[in-house]
């Protein structure tokens, strides 16, 4: 199974939302919008936009596909999809509040780990999302790693900078 199926594949949309929004926020900071003069703050903003984007699927036309991804051991997969969507929204908002940003980032990273079995099921059972094949497992694992890494960087930017010195 190829990592990418074709150029129009939407597997990368959350990644693109993260990268483009982070860079756009940083460009605004470079243009003089002082609250956005830090990469860490712009990354938190990009992550917040990404999680709001992904949360929207929990109630949109992809909802049935997300419900089908929930591992069978969980009762009420419809409720699980709704709850995880709400958690993504709260986490996104928490990333934007300095006092809660680190905790929100850690909680979202844990949420991504908890949701990974649904992605495994979708890939192994050849489920579809929005009428398209689910993300191949190697790409999904790589994306999860990128998202979790971004959350860790957003949660502890000063600690990572000191560790690198």
Give the location of each predicted region:
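Membrane-interface extramembranous regions
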Residues: 2-165
